Amino acid sequence: MPGPPASPPPPMLLLLLLLTVGCARAAPLPQTGAGEVPVVEVPSLFVILSVCSLLILIVLIANCVSCCKDPEIDFKEFEDNFDDEIDFTPPAEDTPSIQSPAEVFTLSVPNISLPAPSQFQASVEGLKSQVARHSLNYIQEIGSGWFGKVLLGETYTGTSVARVIVKELKVSASPKEQDTFLKSGEPYYILQHPNVLQCVGQCVEAIPYLLVFEFCDLGDLKAYLHNEQEHVRGDSQTMLLQRMACEIAAGLAAMHKLHFLHSDLALRNCYLTSDLNVKVGDYGIGFSRYKEDYIETDDKKVFPLRWTAPELVTSFQDRLLTADQTKYSNIWSLGVTLWELFNNAAQPYANLSDLDVLNQVIRERDMKLPKPQLEQPYSDRWYEVLQFCWLPPDKRPAAEDVHRLLTYLRMQSQRDSEVDFEQQWTALKPDTNSRDASSSAAFPILDHFARDRLGREMEEVLTVTETSQGLSFEYVWEAAKHDHFDEQGRGHPDEALSYSSMFFPVEVFENSLSDPGPGKQDDSGQEVPVRAPGVVPVFDAHNLSVGSDYYIQLEEKSSSNLGLDPPALLTTEVDKLERAGAEEPRTEEDFFQSSAHPKEASSTEDSRATSIPGSPFNLFSDLDKADDLPSHQKIFDLMELNGVQADFKPAILSSSLDDPKDTCQSDKEKPHKLLDQGPLCLSESLLHQDHFDPLSVQELSENFLFLQEKNLLKGSLTTKEQVSDLQTELKNAGFTSALLESPQRGSESSELEFLENTLDFPLSQGDTRGQNEGAGVRRHSGTSPQASPALLTEEGSPTAPTDPILKPEETKSFRDVRVPEDSICLELGPDPVTVGVEIPATDAKTLDGGNRPPDVTCQSKEALSLTNRHPILVNDITAQGSVESCLPESRQDLQNEPFSEDPLSVSSLEKHSEAAETLNQLNSKAAPEDAALASALSSDSTSQDSLLEDSLSTPIPTSEQSVETPDSLDSVDVREALLESLGSHTPRKLLPPDKPADSGYETENLESPEWTLHPAPEGTADSDAAAAGDSGHSSLPPNPVIVISDAGDGHRGAEGPPQSFTLGPQSSYRDSAYFSDNDSEPDKKPEEVPGTSANALVLVKGQSPPESVVPEESSDVREGCLEAPQDKPDQSRVSTLQNSCHSELQETLQPTPADASRESCPVNDEASSPLSLLNSEPSSCDDLDTQEDRPCTLASTGTNTNELLAYMSSTLDKSLPSHLESSKLKEPDIEGKYLGKLCVSGMLDLSEDGMDADEEDENSDDSDEDLRAFNLHSLSSESEDDTEHPVPIIVSNDDGRHLRSLLKPSAAEAIEQLPEDWKKEKKAVTFFDDVTVYLFDQETPTKELGHCGGEAHGPGPSSPAASSSSPYLGRCMNSESSTDEEGGGFEWDDDFSPDPFMSKTTSLLGSKPSLQTSKYFSPPPPARSAEQSWPHVSPCSRFSISPANIASFSLTHLTDSDIEQGGSSEDGDKD
């Protein structure tokens, strides 16, 4: 272009010049030719025009040239400007030519072509993907860092302009530095949190990498506080600082949640927005702005020494080395940051130089920041949070924990006051061991409940956690604020699936927390916490027959509830001893001082326990005082101290609750003592008694076999394995091997000793028992001064000076179960071990037949007098052959003869049943409450130690269950059956006593634990006691069955209406299901069942009066069954549907005469042992009375669950009537009632039930119920593996004994008789306290589980029998609810429709006599045959112990209120 325009002008000029020149030349030519004229004629105009044209042409050419030159220059400048950015990797869509103006302009378009930003666009919002380098305008530089400069700038987005902070990476940064730079902004780029600084964009398309952050108008918080120091005053500013602290912690928690770490957490890196919100971030200018906060290392690195956690700093060869930040170090820095915040942004350790800080803080670690100067509410707590942050790394709280604590403090600071602040604060405080605990809790199903306890939301929470001990089901009540008892010893870790821990009472909780785990024992070998309930094997959900080590462990502490549950009472008492500050080397020692000497120890310890202020019995005396210790607390303490005691005490408490507190207390204490001392003696005696052992062992073996067949028993349930496991459990639970071995002091030992003594004494008193069933206990009571003192004290507090435990207040608590001073005392063996089965009648008078002299109560002979009040027990023991006939007769007699003492005795003895089932049977009938107590204590101890050691222990649990837990089938059945049998004629509700004696839970269980002794027909009790006593007398010559008839109990039972008796047992029995799972013991016992340990089972296998036993079916169905199987199996079978249930038991028993013999023997043994007698008697009473049609309710311990259920139904039905009356006789929250160890075989097999039937006769109702619940659900669990087996419903009365038998087969004899699978079958679960334990297949923890099994067992009529059994089950199921409150309805009723379950349970129990609802509900609730008789959930749910159809789901929230509701508490599915 330049060429052409330039060239044209010259030619034109030339032409013009030529023309001009030509013209000029032409002019002269003419002149030359003509003259000069032509020259002058040349026109000047032409020349002018030529010049002008030339000029115009030149101008045009110049213009053209200039135009061409300008575009060329601009283009070059543009290229030069773009050269700086040519380094970026051109986008794929860009053309290689960067000179194109169009391409240049595309760069200004949003970063479509920029690869780096596109990587983050997906995860960022707003400007993050929109920020472009060209849209940034730098305003000024505000600082610098290792990376480069930090600039304040603006970004233009559309029509808006926003200020931003730009971090620019230096151009010379290495690739590593580039990566570090980008990663430093990643948390802020990804996180979207109001308290985390936002990175709005990254510019990485060109070399100067840029990170664009949001701008906080008020700058960093440190500068703000410095500037606003004068204004930071007053409450509003304090609240602002508190909110800022929470926001800082929240920001860090948000970062940690996504595993981001803060590189330099300090107040200088917390930025404040215009609305005073704090954002945690890092502009990277800290060092440039606050150089004094940093020190430089030898490698030219700077770090904030005063904010750095000590573990990050070290020195090597005089060189400082720093490690990378961790979450733990961030927490340390957080603490320092918060300290700054509360100290006006003062520098930490301002008085120390950097070197001093390095030495004292970092290296020495001997200095911490002082308390902040800021004055604020709970300033100490705020500082405490800071100190948490400065703990060792592994103990520091998580950022979330700090935030939770700060939030709570801030909320509390804004409130005027909160009563529960300290409590809530304690709950919120991080546990230094929480890290380990959380790691061990693999299944914190409900962990958030415990974690997020900012308010009362934690009042009722069921927490399921997997601990090293297994799956823990923890039900936390408000009262039980210590919701986590994981620190306590639990079942074996391999038992995780089945491990259940339900905690209800505060005392129990506290004790559990304070006490060593169930595996810990006092010097006496007894577990201070509720050891009786301890770790109990639960039927394996999947392979019940493998004898796996699954346990349902109700923390002994929590498992024991109010005195309502004999076990709970004992536990409470024990805990109380500790809690009361009467730290005894062994509560069991206190309770059973002579625990090593079963007989003497029983008496001595009983008296001593009563006399010792710290002893659980004295605790009860305190309970009597009721001012020093809450009844539940005491009860729980006793329970926790030792399962035996727990069983004992609750029975006493139950007595007290039932009627006269004195009598009740004494009764409970006695049962307690019995268990602790007597039960130990009993179990030892029983163990050593051939009759007991053979029958117990045989029945146990059968039960175990059945359970194994049903896969209900796990491998650990194998006889020896189970024994060892159980012994280990018991030892772990605080029961020493001595306890395990009857002579030991442990709760188990005491129980065993008591049982042993009881058995020995019954043997010595076998005649006595046979002679005076009424006087047997009385005679025992009076005859065994040694045991009598404590036992009597416990048994007949009013009588014994040591009965302060049974003070008038206590008497009030137990007024319904009030047993005069003639409370049943059991004398075990040669030395009178007063079972202390004070069968508090509805009135002591009733039990007493009016009033019992205190000494009568205290006399072990009088305790043996239980035979009078539980003649059924005596009869059962004595007349095994005539069990059926005797049972109805005895039951009738008991019913006809008002044995107010008998019911109590039954209850207590049933509680003792675990320790001395025979004694429990005798006592159960005669003194239900005492029987229950003794049974419960014995049951717990035995189940853990004694059962491991002896079959007798197994019987004790039955008794205990019957007495302890209405909810638990065993406790409900035995106690209620006894009450029913004894008090059915003289139905007396111990509802008031139930109310007086709280469940031991500080929560709503207070009402629930009321000892709701259900009156049982006196005639029945008498008959049963007499029959049992007679039978026991004859069949237990070697080991005297302790007829636990209080001095006045026996005759009192005769004199007083059965209501007393009912009161006792009901009172004793708590709404707690105690699947006492002496796996090793029962397993061992089943092996011994053939005839090894006569002692092992209260039921004497050798005894021939099964008929007598059969009569005791309802309350002592087990006992009766144990006895009945020999004589009565046929008769039982012949029985009708009610009979049928009875029959089923008998059938189970019938198949094996040995079982029958064994059953009869246990009955004898039980007759020998007050506990078994008590259990047998109440059951027998009920059974005789109610189950004349169904002879051997408890006897169905065979493998046939349906038979067992049917039998139990009949038993329950018979016992339920009185129990219905006395349903209010809330079983003292004895979840520990021995529901467990009721092997399916023992439950279903009458033959195996021989011993267990006696046990269950003791706990006929509870035991049956428990059996039902236990076997139903456990069987259902098994049944899933096998087919649907009529899951044996753990009957209250039957259960303890039956379970006991299952748990403790006699030595070789029992083992020989036990089926091969008996070990597997031996697994049982013991619930202690008002615990609603829903056992379910761990894989399917839903209600559905129970339905299948329940439906499977449709063949039971929902007749009164079914109804009765249903109430039993309800009790068992209501173990918590019923037990807690009134032993009434089930929480299920509200939560689930009872119809399906009821129909199933009805079917299940249809073949069995239905249990009477009164048993389970303090107010006689409508018969819940369906609910009570849990459907056979064999196919559906392994652990549908709760009404499978209604609530198989184990994770059900249980409330005391529900329990208090009595008949309406659905969570009666304790099992």
From Swiss-Prot:
| Keywords carried by this UniProt record | ATP-binding, Kinase, Membrane, Nucleotide-binding, Phosphoprotein, Serine/threonine-protein kinase, Transferase, Transmembrane, Transmembrane helix
**For side Cytoplasmic, which residue ranges?**
1-10, 63-1471
Q: What is its main location?
A: membrane
Q: In this protein, which residues make up the domain named Protein kinase?
A: 136-406
Q: Which residue ranges have biased composition labelled Polar residues? A: 954-965, 1059-1070, 1132-1151, 1399-1416
Q: Does the keyword Transmembrane helix apply?
A: yes
Name the residues that span the membrane.
Answer: 11-31, 42-62
BP GO terms, sorted: axon guidance; early endosome to late endosome transport; endocytic recycling; nervous system development; neurotrophin TRK receptor signaling pathway; receptor recycling; transferrin transport
Which sequence positions carry the modification called Phosphothreonine? 783
User: Where is the protein situated, by its record's location annotation?
Assistant: Membrane
Question: Where are the Lumenal topological domains?
Answer: 32-41
Q: Which residues bind ATP?
A: 142-150, 167
State whether keyword Cell cycle applies.
Answer: no
Q: Where, per the database record, does this protein carry Phosphoserine?
A: 781, 784, 797, 1076, 1274, 1276-1277, 1279, 1418, 1464-1465
Active-site residues, Swiss-Prot/TrEMBL: 264
SUPFAM superfamilies found in the cross-reference section: Protein kinase-like (PK-like) (SSF56112)
Major enzyme class: transferase
> What exactly does this protein do?
Phosphorylates PPP1C, phosphorylase b and CFTR.
Family classification: Belongs to the protein kinase superfamily. Tyr protein kinase family.
Q: What is this protein called?
A: Serine/threonine-protein kinase LMTK2
Q: Which organism is it from?
A: Mus musculus
Q: Which gene encodes it?
A: Lmtk2
